Amino acid sequence: MKKKKEYRIAVLPGDGIGPEVMQEAYKILNVINKKFDFNIYTNEYDIGGIAIDKYGAPLPKKTLNGCIESHAILFGSIGGKEWTHLPADEQPERGGLLPLRKFFNLFVNLRPIKLHFSLKKLSPLKKEIIQDGFDILCVRELIGGIYFGLPKGKNTFDKKNISAFDTEIYSTKEIEKIADIAFQLSLKRKKKVFSIDKANVLESSMLWREVVIQVSKRYPNVELIHLYIDNAAMQLIKNPNQFDVILCSNLFGDILSDECAALTGSLGMLPSASLNESFFGLFEPAGGSAPDLKGKNIANPIAQILSLALLFKYSLQLEKISHLIELSVLKTLEKGYRTLDISNGKKYITTDQMGNYIAKTLSELIN
């Protein structure tokens, strides 16, 4: 008898609403395990604030080792006011998530941002701007740039005039790697790459533009458009439908991907993937830990479920299953089911009810 293929997923629910929305992702995994001829094994590990409380560190060795032994990481959310008193490097994000990204060399962050037809009323943009919807993929460099550049610190010699500094630094190879990913992904889309920089002012952006132009020559069928960061922020508001793949440095990508997300009306709908060159990845909702929603059974689990869909697509290379999960979400929304954040003041369902409906729809689609 042929042995079933096995996949191992490290599950890191984290803090805030993370554990609640993760329960809904488990429902999807249960359906998939029953319906397909392979086995998905999950192991849960602590990270962030809960790990600080249990082990005194935001990224325990047990958690890191569990991730190393897995094919992918399904991540919830971390952080909360309980841990803001700690030194910056010991807080949940800087001490937990950032080192995890660095350890696995997760240099590319993908954030697909779509405006669902059934949710157009939630967008803050005028209906004439979003009448055609939009489908944007933000490709952000994740482990370089100003967040990691050295030196950084404070000058405290003059107590009356303290200064602080950070360093924005990128190498040719770093830019080439992320640009190559953006162009490859554009080939399966509308074949447009919008490269974002500030090349009229910043040396790092000047190099960014030079390298991206060189990479673009390997993709003659892809149109390359350069935009300054300030103009890009404006164009996203005026005409989001013009965009396809947006290629950004770490800082600019952090800003623009959140702006794109806001245009949909709810962060609770948006997944993200952080990948390395072998497509091992960490998959997480784009929103935060939302501690004010914790334990109320009202958080939107769709971003967590769609993050699982991205995990199947990129790390497990099972695009059919990824598509089925996305289709299950879409069909559930088309039936009119809404959590509080996307209810627009009308009747809404709970976190676990939304998970149940999506899992039921997935099961029906597979049958």
Curated annotation (Swiss-Prot):
Binding site for NAD(+): 80-93, 288-300
Gene Ontology cellular-component annotations: cytosol
Gene giving rise to this polypeptide: leuB
Enzyme Commission code(s) on record: 1.1.1.85
InterPro entries assigned to the protein according to its UniProt record, in alphabetical order: IsoCit/isopropylmalate_DH_CS, IsoPropMal-DH-like_dom, Isopropylmalate_DH
Assembly mode: Homodimer.
The protein's name in its UniProt record: 3-isopropylmalate dehydrogenase
GO biological process, one term: L-leucine biosynthetic process
Location (main, coarse): cytoplasm
Pathway where this protein functions: Amino-acid biosynthesis; L-leucine biosynthesis; L-leucine from 3-methyl-2-oxobutanoate: step 3/4
Domain of life: Bacteria
Cell compartments where the protein resides: Cytoplasm
Function: Catalyzes the oxidation of 3-carboxy-2-hydroxy-4-methylpentanoate (3-isopropylmalate) to 3-carboxy-4-methyl-2-oxopentanoate. The product decarboxylates to 4-methyl-2 oxopentanoate.
Keyword Metal-binding among record annotations: yes
Sequence similarity: Belongs to the isocitrate and isopropylmalate dehydrogenases family. LeuB type 1 subfamily.
Catalytic activity line of the entry: (2R,3S)-3-isopropylmalate + NAD(+) = 4-methyl-2-oxopentanoate + CO2 + NADH
Broad enzyme group: oxidoreductase
